[in-house]
Amino acid sequence: MNLFFEKTEATNVAEFSVSEIAGALKRVVEERFGYVRVRGEISGYRGAHASGHVYFSLKDDKARLEAVIWRGIMEKLKFPPEEGMEVIAVGKLTTYPGSSKYQIVIEALEPTGVGALMTLLENRKKKLADEGLFDEAKKKPLPYMPRIIGVVTSPTGAVIRDIIHRISDRFPLHILVWPVRVQGDTSGREVADALKGFNALPFGGLVPKPDLIIVARGGGSLEDLWGFNDEAVVRAVYESALPVISAVGHETDWTLIDYVADWRAPTPTGAAERAVPVKLDLEVQVASLGARLRMGLARYFDFHQQKLRALVRGLPTVDQLFALPRRGFDEISSRLQRALCVSCDKKRFYFHGLNLRLSPRLLNTEKELRNTKEYTARLHRAFVRNVEKQRAQLEVASRLLKSTSYQNILERGFVLALGPDNKLIKRLVQFPETGQINLRFFDGEMSVSARDHGLNRSSKSKRIKSKQDDQGTLF
C-alpha cells in the first residue's frame, strides 16, 4: 500500500480527484446503458416532492434501484404510481455524484399485469364519475342529418374502411378523418388532440368543421384499448362542443370513453349506421383517391417524424441538463425546512419560559412607569407656563426701568453735574468754589474748573432767565 503514496519517478498510478472519478463513472454508465426497460416493484413512494418531482425505488427479491420522475414527465403519465405496484419503467441510467448513487431517470411507466390495470381503471372511473363527467343530463343530442362527419381513428385500419363504406351506402356526405395511433403509449394523447383539433376548426374555414365526431377502433385486449381509458381522452370528449359517438372495440368491450360519449355504438359499423339515417351509393373512385392521399401523407409525415426524432434524441433534454441542480435543490430545500422547524421549536420554548417568569410586580412597575411619564409631562407643561409668566413680568419691569433711567433724560438735552467726590450736585449750594467738576452728557463726559464769581448761593435767590435760556427743567 505504501507504493501508492510514495511520490517516486517509477510509479505509474494516475491520481484522480473525487469529482473526476464521479464524472467518469457517470459517463460510463450513461454511455454504456442509455435507455433501458426495468421491471420491478415500487418501493418508498411517498407522493410528489414540493418541487413536483417524484423519488422512489424499484426493487425485486435481490436488488434495489433508485428512481426519479421529473415533474414534466409525471404530469404526462397515464396512471399515478402507487406503493407496491409492479411496473415496467423506461428511462436512462445515470449517477448522482453528490452521494455516489446510480439511478434511473424514468420517462415512461406502465403497470404489468391485467389485475393492476383493472385496479387502476376502476379508481380512475370512480374519480371521473365523482366529478360528474358521466352524467346523462350533460350529454348532447346527436344531429339527425349531419352535413360533415369527423372520424378519429387509424387511417390504415379496417375500421375507417367499414365506417366509410357504411356511411357511403346509407348517405354519401363529407367525412373528415383525423389519423391517430389507436394503440401504444401516445394513442391517448393523439386522440385527445384530434378531438380538440376538430373543435378548434372555424366555421367557413378552408377545412370544414364537422357536425358530428366518431371515435372508432377495432377490438382488442385491455392493454390494446388502454389508450381510450386515458383521462385526457375522457376530458376532451366531455369538453367537446360537438357531439361524439364512441365505437371502440366489440360490443363487450367497455372503455372510459364509452361512459362520457354522447352515444355508444357497439361496433364502428353501428356508429356509421347511427350517424346517418339513409343509404346511398358512394363513389368508389373518390374513396380510393382519398385513401391513397391519406396513406401517402401518413407515410410522408411518419418518415419526417422519425427523422426529426432521430435528431432530437441526439440533443440533451432540459431534464438531463437540470438533473443534478434539481436534485441538489431538493436536498437543500428539505434541510432548510427541517432547520426552520427546529428553530421555531427553540424560539417557542424560549418564549414559553419567559412567559412563566412574568409576575404581577412587573405589571405594577409598568403602571407606575406610565404614571411617572404622565406626571413628568404635566410638570413640564407647568414649568413652561411659569417660565412664560415670569418672562412676561420681567419684560414689563424692564420697560418700566428703562422709562425711569436718567439716560433717557440726558438724551433730551440735560446734563448731569458731578462734584470732585463724584457725587451728584442737586442744589446750587452744593456747587464747589474750586476744584474739578465733571459734566456728563448723553454721549460722553468732560471736566471743568469751578471758580467763584460771586454767585448768590442762597437757595431762595431767584434765577434770572436770560433770553437764550430756553432749556426746560430737569425734573
From Swiss-Prot:
Its main location: cytoplasm. Disulfide bonds: none annotated. Residues 466-475 have a biased composition (Basic and acidic residues). It is an enzyme of class 3 (hydrolase). Its EC number is 3.1.11.6. It is found in: Cytoplasm. One of its GO terms (biological process) is DNA catabolic process. Pfam families: Exonuc_VII_L, tRNA_anti_2. It catalyses: Exonucleolytic cleavage in either 5'- to 3'- or 3'- to 5'-direction to yield nucleoside 5'-phosphates. One of its GO terms (molecular function) is nucleic acid binding. Keywords: Cytoplasm, Exonuclease, Hydrolase, Nuclease. One of its GO terms (cellular component) is cytoplasm. InterPro entries: Exonuc_VII_L, Exonuc_VII_lsu_C, OB-fold_nuc-bd_dom. Residues 452-475 are annotated as: Disordered. Bidirectionally degrades single-stranded DNA into large acid-insoluble oligonucleotides, which are then degraded further into small acid-soluble oligonucleotides. Heterooligomer composed of large and small subunits. Belongs to the XseA family. This is Exodeoxyribonuclease 7 large subunit. The lineage of its organism: Bacteria, Pseudomonadati, Pseudomonadota, Alphaproteobacteria, Hyphomicrobiales.
